[in-house]
C-alpha cells in the first residue's frame, strides 16, 4: 500500500501499531544515550561519584537542546502531515525547508551557549570544583557539536510525517550503536585511544548523534518524494514559521519545562548531593519509560492530523481511542519493570552512596507513570487538532505550577529533619493525577468543538 493511501485507508489501530512501534523504539533508543553514558561513567575507576553528579547537573541543558529540536519537529510533523492530507505538495516543500532553516538558527544559539555560558550554569548548582570541571567539559562538547541532535530531530519528524517512521528508527539505532561502542573506548581508554573520562562520554554521544543525523538526511532526500527538496525552500517564510510554532511551541515549552523542572529540583535537592544524584539517575530511567509514551504520541499526532485534514470524523475518533489504550498498556508495563527491578538499575549505574535514595525515588515516582503517559497522549491529540493552548496548560501544570511548589514545600519538612527525602518524591504522582483530571476535561471540550462538528 502506498504511503499516502496508508494514511488514508489503513485501519487506524493497525496503522498506529505500524507507525508507533518504530517511533517507540526510536524514542527509547534516544533515552539510551543518557542511560549508557551514566552507566559507563558510574563504573569509572576514579571520580565516578563526582562524574555522576556532573552528568545530573548538565542533563537539563541536554534536555533543553532536545526540546527545541523535537518541538520544532513536532510542529513540522503535524503541519506537514496536514498539508499533505490536503494535497498541497508545494506548501509541504516550504514547510520542510523552513524547518531546516530553523535548525540552523537553533544550532547557532547552542554553539554560543557552549562557548560562553556553560561554566556559569554549572556553578549555579554546585560548589564542588571536581564536579564543576567535569560538568563544564561534558556540556561544552555537547553544545558545540549539537548540530547532530538538532538535525536528527528534524529529519526524524519529516520522515514520520510521511509515514516512514521505520527509517527514522534505523537512523536512531545506528546512532545508539555507535554511542555504545565508543563509550568504553573513549571513557576508559582502549587501544590507541587515551582515557578521557567524562569527555569521552560526551564525544561518544555527539558522534552517535551526528551519525544518526547524516543517515536520516540521506533517507529524507531519497524517500520523501511527496514534495520537492532544495535550498530555495529554506528561504524563511514568516507565515509557515508561525504555523510551525503555533503547533510546535507548546511541545517546545513542554520539553523545556521538563528541563526547568529538573534544574529546579537539583536546586531543591542541593542540600543532599546523594539525593540530587539519585534523582538525576532516576530521571534517566523515567525518561526511558515516558519516551515510550512520547514515541506513541508521535504516531498519534500525524495520524489524527492527517484525518483532520481529510475531515474524517471516524478516523479521528479511532486515533484518540487507540492512542489512549496503547499508551495505558505501555505505561503499565513500565510501572511493572521499575517497581520490580529497582535494585538492578541501581547496580547498573553503580550508584554508591546514592543507591538507597535512587531505589526510594523509583518506588514512589514510578506510580505516576500511568497518569503521565495519559497526559502525554492527551497532548499529542491536542496538537493534532490545533489545541496548542490546552497542551501548554497541561505542560505548565505538570512541570511548573503544581510540581515545583509542592516539592519545595515538602523539602522544608525534609530539611528540618521531620521526615525522609521520600516525601519530596510524592510530589510527582500527586501532580500527574491532578493534571490528568484537567486533561480529561480539555479532551471532552476539544472533541465537542473540533470532532463532533464534522460529518
Task: Tell what function each PLM region has.
Residues 23, 27, 39, 78, ...:
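Transmembrane alpha-helix boundary and packing residues in multipass membrane permease domains
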Residues 28, 32-53, 122-129, 185-196, ...:
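Helix-terminus/linker motif at the lipid-water interface of multi-pass membrane proteins
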Residues 52-112, 149-168, 278-342, 372-386, ...:
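Small-residue-rich hydrophobic transmembrane alpha-helices
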Residues 1-20, 80-147, 193-248, 304-368, ...:
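Short alpha-helical transmembrane segments in multi-pass integral membrane proteins
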Residues 18-37, 141, 175, 208-212, ...:
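Transmembrane helical elements of multi-pass membrane transporters/channels
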Residues 7-39, 43-47, 60-75, 79, ...:
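N-terminal transmembrane alpha-helices
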Residues 73, 142-160, 168-176, 201-216, ...:
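Short runs within selected transmembrane alpha-helices of multi-pass transporters and secretion channels
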Residues 49-60, 135, 139, 202, ...:
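Small-residue hotspots at the loop-to-helix junctions and early N-terminal turns
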Amino acid at each position: 500500500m502506498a504511503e499516502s493511501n496508508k494514511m488514508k485507508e489503513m485501519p487506524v489501530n493497525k496503522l498506529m501499531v505500524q507507525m508507533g512501534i518504530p517511533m517507540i523504539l526510536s524514542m527509547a533508543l534516544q533515552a539510551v544515550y543518557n542511560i549508557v553514558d551514566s552507566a559507563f561513567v558510574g563504573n569509572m575507576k576514579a571520580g565516578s561519584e563526582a562524574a555522576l553528579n556532573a552528568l545530573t547537573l548538565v542533563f537539563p541543558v541536554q534536555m533543553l537542546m532536545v526540546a527545541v529540536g523535537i518541538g520544532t519537529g513536532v510542529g513540522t510533523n503535524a503541519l506537514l502531515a496536514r498539508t499533505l492530507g490536503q494535497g498541497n505538495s508545494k506548501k509541504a516543500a516550504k514547510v520542510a525547508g523552513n524547518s531546516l532553516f530553523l535548525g540552523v538558527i537553533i544550532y547557532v544559539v547552542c554553539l554560543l551557549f557552549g562557548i560562553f555560558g556553560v561554566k556559569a550554569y554549572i556553578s549555579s548548582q554546585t560548589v564542588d570544583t571536581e564536579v564543576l570541571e567535569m560538568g563544564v567539559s561534558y556540556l561544552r562538547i555537547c553544545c558545540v557539536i549539537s548540530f547532530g541532535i538538532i538535525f536528527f530531530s528534524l529529519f526524524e519528524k519529516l520522515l514520520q510525517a510521511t509515514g516512514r517512521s521505520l527509517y527514522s528508527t534505523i537512523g536512531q539505532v545506528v546512532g545508539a550503536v555507535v554511542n555504545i561502542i565508543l563509550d568504553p573506548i573513549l571513557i576508559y581508554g582502549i587501544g590507541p585511544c587515551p582515557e578521557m573520562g567524562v569527555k569521552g562520554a560526551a564525544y561518544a554521544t555527539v558522534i552517535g548523534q551526528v551519525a544518526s543525523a547524516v543517515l536520516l538526511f540521506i533517507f529524507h532526500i531519497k524517500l520523501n518524494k511527496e514534495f520537492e527538496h532544495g535550498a530555495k525552500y529554506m528561504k524563511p517564510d514568516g507565515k509557515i514559521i508561525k504555523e510551525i510554532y503555533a503547533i510546535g511551541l507548546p511541545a517546545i515549552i513542554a520539553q523545556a519545562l521538563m528541563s526547568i523542572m529538573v534544574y529546579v529540583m537539583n536546586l531543591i535537592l542541593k542540600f543532599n548531593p546523594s539525593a540530587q544524584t539519585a534523582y538525576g539517575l532516576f530521571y534517566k530511567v523515567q525518561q526511558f519509560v515516558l519516551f515510550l509514551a512520547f514515541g506513541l504520541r508521535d504516531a498519534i499526532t500525524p495520524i489524527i492530523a492527517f484525518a483532520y485534514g481529510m475531515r474524517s470524523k471516524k478516523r479521528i475518533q479511532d486515533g484518540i481511542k487507540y492512542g489512549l489504550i496503547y499508551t495505558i498498556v505501555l505505561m503499565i508495563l513500565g510501572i511493572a519493570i521499575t517497581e520490580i527491578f529497582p535494585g538492578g538499575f541501581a547496580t547498573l549505574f553503580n550508584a554508591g552512596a546514592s543507591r538507597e535514595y535512587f531505589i526510594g525515588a523509583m518506588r514512589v515516582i514510578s506510580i505516576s507513570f500511568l497518569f503521565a503517559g495519559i497526559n502525554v497522549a492527551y497532548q499529542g491529540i491536542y496538537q493534532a487538532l490545533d489545541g496548542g493552548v490546552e497542551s501548554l496548560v497541561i505542560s505548565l501544570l505538570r512541570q511548573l505550577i503544581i510540581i515545583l511548589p509542592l516539592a519545595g514545600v515538602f523539602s522544608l519538612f525534609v530539611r528540618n529533619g521531620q521526615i525522609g527525602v521520600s516525601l519530596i518524591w510524592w510530589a510527582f504522582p500527586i501532580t500527574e493525577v491532578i493534571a490528568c483530571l484537567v486533561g480529561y476535561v480539555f479532551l471532552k471540550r476539544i472533541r465537542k468543538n473540533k470532532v463532533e462538528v464534522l460529518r
